[in-house]
C-alpha cells in the first residue's frame, strides 16, 4: 500500500514538473516568448505606462464620473474655510 502511494506521489510530481517546464513563457512586455533582456526593460515599462495613460485618457472622456473636478475643488475650498475658521477661533 505504501509503495503504491510513493509511486502515485512520484507520478504526480513528475506530471507537475513537466507541466511547469512546458508552460508558456511571458516576457516583461507581456509579449509571448523571448528572453528577458535588462536593456529592454525600460522600454517595455515605458510602453506599458504609455498604454495605461492612453487607456486612462479614453476612459476619462467616456466615464460619467468625470465631472468630479468641480466637486474636488469645492471640497478643497470647504476644507480651507474650515481651517481658517478654526484658526480664527483659536486666536480669540
Swiss-Prot record:
Q: Which InterPro entries is this protein grouped with?
A: GnRH (IPR002012), Gonadoliberin (IPR019792), Gonadoliberin_I_precursor (IPR004079)
Single GO cellular component term? extracellular region
Q: Which UniProt keywords apply?
A: Amidation, Cleavage on pair of basic residues, Hormone, Pyrrolidone carboxylic acid, Secreted, Signal
Report the residues modified as Glycine amide: 33
Q: What is its subcellular localisation?
A: Secreted
Principal place where this protein is found? secreted
Origin superkingdom: Eukaryota
Gene Ontology terms: biological process: luteinizing hormone secretion; positive regulation of luteinizing hormone secretion; regulation of hormone biosynthetic process; regulation of signaling; regulation of testosterone secretion; response to alkaloid; response to serotonin
Q: Which residues carry this modification: Pyrrolidone carboxylic acid?
A: 24
Q: Name one GO molecular function term.
A: gonadotropin-releasing hormone receptor binding
Extent of the signal sequence? 1-23
User: Family per UniProt?
Assistant: Belongs to the GnRH family.
Functional summary from the UniProt entry: Stimulates the secretion of gonadotropins.
Record-linked PANTHER family = GONADOLIBERIN, PROGONADOLIBERIN-1
UniProt name for this protein: Progonadoliberin-1
Tell me the organism.
Answer: Gallus gallus
Taxonomic lineage per UniProt?
A: Eukaryota, Metazoa, Chordata, Craniata, Vertebrata
Amino acid at each position: 500500500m505504501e509503495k503504491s502511494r510513493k509511486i502515485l506521489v512520484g507520478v504526480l510530481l513528475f506530471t507537475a514538473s513537466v507541466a511547469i517546464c512546458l508552460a508558456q513563457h511571458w516576457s516583461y512586455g507581456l509579449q509571448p516568448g523571448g528572453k528577458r533582456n535588462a536593456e529592454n526593460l525600460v522600454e517595455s515599462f515605458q510602453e506599458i505606462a504609455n498604454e495605461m495613460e492612453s487607456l486612462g485618457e479614453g476612459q476619462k472622456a467616456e466615464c460619467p464620473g468625470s465631472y468630479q473636478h468641480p466637486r474636488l475643488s469645492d471640497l478643497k475650498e470647504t476644507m480651507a474655510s474650515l481651517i481658517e475658521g478654526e484658526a480664527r477661533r483659536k486666536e480669540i
